[in-house]
Amino acid sequence: MAERKAEVTRNTLETQITCKINLDGSGQARFETGVPFLDHMLDQVARHGLIDMDIVAKGDLHIDAHHTVEDIGITLGQAVAKALGDKKGIRRYGHSYVPLDEALSRVVIDFSGRPGLEMHVEFTRSMIGQFDVDLFYEFFQGFVNHAQVTLHIDNLRGRNSHHQIETVFKAFGRALRMALELDPRMAGIMPSTKGAL
């Protein structure tokens, strides 16, 4: 089996980001993004998705975290697409429900080649520490556009915003793991009746 690894670098006037991933890893991760709460969430994706990740980012955090968070989503999406290659043999679809105390979220993903995001999370507050919860949408939109996936995110219940988004990221990691897994019965076969994704 060919290694499903990738390294992507993104350099703009706003951010400089390097992302290395191994889709068939063990969940080892290192993050230096300058946005601690995002690091915490990305760690959930790595651990629950069993994806090795190494992301280093320098952004215009003196303005705010918007560009950094969005561009990390973009770069991670590009890295996943690059590591995945032609998509032959993958399960393609993934889904997961994850609880954390009172919070429960569902994430469903399709490596369809058609970017689309449906994110429905009614946060109970606008900030988690110093992190603006609006930026989670920007992260996932960046990922979706560049990984070329359809992604449905629903927080079904929750009172604590930290718990709400942590269940989302854990479920995202587990849905990724399921969708990216190689199906031995589909070896070398495109998971689409069209013959292309």
Swiss-Prot record:
Pathway(s) where this gene product acts: Amino-acid biosynthesis; L-histidine biosynthesis; L-histidine from 5-phospho-alpha-D-ribose 1-diphosphate: step 6/9
Catalyzed reactions per annotation: D-erythro-1-(imidazol-4-yl)glycerol 3-phosphate = 3-(imidazol-4-yl)-2-oxopropyl phosphate + H2O
Signal peptide feature range: none
Protein name as it appears in the record: Imidazoleglycerol-phosphate dehydratase
Subcellular location(s) per record: Cytoplasm
Matching SUPFAM superfamilies: Ribosomal protein S5 domain 2-like
GO molecular-function terms, A-Z: imidazoleglycerol-phosphate dehydratase activity
GO-annotated cellular components: cytoplasm
Organism whose genome encodes this protein: Hahella chejuensis (strain KCTC 2396)
Enzyme class: lyase
GO biological process: L-histidine biosynthetic process
Main location: cytoplasm
Keyword entries, A-Z: Amino-acid biosynthesis, Cytoplasm, Histidine biosynthesis, Lyase
The family this protein is said to belong to: Belongs to the imidazoleglycerol-phosphate dehydratase family.
E.C. designation(s): 4.2.1.19
